């Protein structure tokens, strides 16, 4: 039986710059680092970065694949301003209903999409049950 997410690993093109991004911009606690890898605790999630210089990265920008982290609604504007001040690549978000809560989409230095989201799964399901009758719900 699967018990939960064990860790998330990203390949990065420059480990030193990526360590700075995740530590200094997102506030991750660095646990260990080497010349080509680093482990962090980011909101209770084990995040691993491995430097891999010669892999294609151009397709990343075409995918909606991303990792979302929870933030409070009260911190939303502060996070947005912090990312902007630090010249993080903030992406245009999708149009959303207020019941779907707020999100900031952005990329790390290698184009991996990340999201800061104020809602929960319960918020999303409640909204969808109300607004999307074409969906089948099992909970």
Curated annotation (Swiss-Prot):
E.C. numbers: 2.5.1.-
InterPro entries, alphabetized: Fosfomycin_Res_Enzymes, Glyas_Bleomycin-R_OHBP_Dase, Glyas_Fos-R_dOase_dom, Metallothiol_Trafse_FosB, VOC
Subcellular location per the Swiss-Prot or TrEMBL entry: Cytoplasm
Transferase found in the keyword field: yes
Record-level GO BP terms: response to antibiotic
GO cellular component: cytoplasm
Binding site for Mg(2+): 7, 66, 115
Cofactor(s) required for function per UniProt: Mg(2+)
Catalytic center residues: 115
Keywords: Antibiotic resistance, Cytoplasm, Magnesium, Metal-binding, Plasmid, Transferase
Enzyme class: transferase
GO MF, one annotated term: transferase activity, transferring alkyl or aryl (other than methyl) groups
VOC domain sequence ranges: 4-119
SUPFAM superfamilies associated with the record: Glyoxalase/Bleomycin resistance protein/Dihydroxybiphenyl dioxygenase
Source organism superkingdom: Bacteria
Family label: Belongs to the fosfomycin resistance protein family. FosB subfamily.
Subunit organization: Homodimer.
Function text: Metallothiol transferase which confers resistance to fosfomycin by catalyzing the addition of a thiol cofactor to fosfomycin. L-cysteine is probably the physiological thiol donor.
Protein name: Metallothiol transferase FosB
Species name: Staphylococcus haemolyticus (strain JCSC1435)
């Amino acid at each position: 039986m699967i018990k939960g997410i064990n860790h998330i690993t990203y390949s990065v093109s420059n480990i030193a710059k990526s360590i700075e991004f995740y530590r200094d911009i997102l506030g991750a606690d660095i646990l260990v680092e080497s010349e080509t890898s680093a482990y962090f605790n980011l909101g209770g999630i084990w995040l691993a970065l491995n430097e891999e210089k010669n892999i294609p990265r151009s397709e990343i920008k075409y995918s909606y694949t991303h990792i979302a982290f929870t933030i409070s609604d009260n911190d939303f504007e502060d996070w947005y301003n912090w990312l902007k001040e630090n010249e993080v690549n903030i992406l245009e978000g999708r149009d959303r209903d207020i019941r779907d809560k707020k999100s900031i989409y952005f990329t790390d230095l290698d184009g991996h999409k990340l999201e800061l989201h104020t809602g929960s799964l319960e918020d999303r399901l409640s909204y969808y049950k109300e607004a999307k009758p074409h969906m089948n719900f099992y909970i």
